[in-house]
Amino acid sequence: MLDKVKNVIVVLSGKGGVGKSTVSTQLALALRATGHKVGLLDIDLCGPSVPYLLGLEGSDIYQCEDGWVPIYTDESKTLAVMSIGFLLKNRNDPVIWRGPKKTMMIRQFLTDVKWEDMDYLIIDTPPGTSDEHITVMECMREVPCNGAIIVTTPQGVALDDVRKEITFCKKTGIKLLGIVENMSGFVCPHCTECTNIFSSNGGAELARLAQVPHLGTLPIDPRVGVLSGSTASVLNELPDSSTAQIMRNIVQHLDALTAVPTPAQV
């Protein structure tokens, strides 16, 4: 039930291992840190990592008359989370489903979860372009989806897959809100200097060629990795980091696109 959700943002990646779920999670936390009410929906059925990233493993969801009730991270109920990970008894249990069953589960997540007055719903999708993505796009035709953010790394093999993702978005009619280049450079935990140990600026160049906004370049920062397993936002814990600055910029970009006022500045 998305009738109480003002804005829907889909987070995509051309391939796995680019940090899409981490970006989705920190974006949701950054939006909450700036005063928004946020929902985070993890539809990566075969590799749900959002419960782990937020330290919510072992949480139980239940159903009410209006549908599934998401997990709230605290009593303020400003961040609601739903993932198939909450339905698995063991984190190591594989989800061995054929396409139709996956499609049915995703439709349930998009239509039967009781989201309450959310400014934003962030949807963390599986990597690639598959049945799951087509299902999401079909369901998004029934609700106001603002568009998609694509996460990539600067390596050529990842960028090749992102080109396919861009084509997929165009063919399915979803607006591209921008590209985030992740894992670009390494931040020394001692001096905080960033060194480009791999290639860099591939995401920025791809955004230029695709004529979509380049939302920022995120480095590998061990300090950000330490926040995994908690609901701590980089905006609060590492306010001077480059990751925090990029997340602020993305929040401001989304607020400008959606005309949602920012209740608080962090």
UniProtKB/Swiss-Prot annotation:
UniProt GO BP: iron-sulfur cluster assembly
The keyword ATP-binding belongs to this UniProt entry's keyword annotation: yes
One GO molecular-function entry: ATP binding
Cofactor: [4Fe-4S] cluster
Pfam families (alphabetical): ParA
Cofactor binding note: Binds 4 [4Fe-4S] clusters per heterotetramer. Contains two stable clusters in the N-termini of Nubp1 and two labile, bridging clusters between subunits of the Nubp1-Nubp2 heterotetramer.
Record flagged with keyword Zinc: no
Gene3D superfamilies linked to this entry: P-loop containing nucleotide triphosphate hydrolases (3.40.50.300)
Keywords in alphabetical order: 4Fe-4S, ATP-binding, Cytoplasm, Iron, Iron-sulfur, Metal-binding, Nucleotide-binding
One cellular component term from this protein's GO annotations in UniProt: cytosol
Superkingdom as given in the UniProt entry: Eukaryota
Main location: cytoplasm
Entry-linked InterPro entries: Mrp-like_CS, Mrp/NBP35_ATP-bd, NUBP2/Cfd1_eukaryotes, P-loop_NTPase, YlxH/NBP35
Binding positions (ATP): 14-21
Subunit: Heterotetramer of 2 Nubp1 and 2 Nubp2 chains.
Similarity section: Belongs to the Mrp/NBP35 ATP-binding proteins family. Nubp2/CFD1 subfamily.
Function field: Component of the cytosolic iron-sulfur (Fe/S) protein assembly (CIA) machinery. Required for maturation of extramitochondrial Fe-S proteins. The Nubp1-Nubp2 heterotetramer forms a Fe-S scaffold complex, mediating the de novo assembly of an Fe-S cluster and its transfer to target apoproteins.
Name of this chain's protein: Cytosolic Fe-S cluster assembly factor Nubp2 homolog
Organism: Drosophila virilis (Fruit fly)
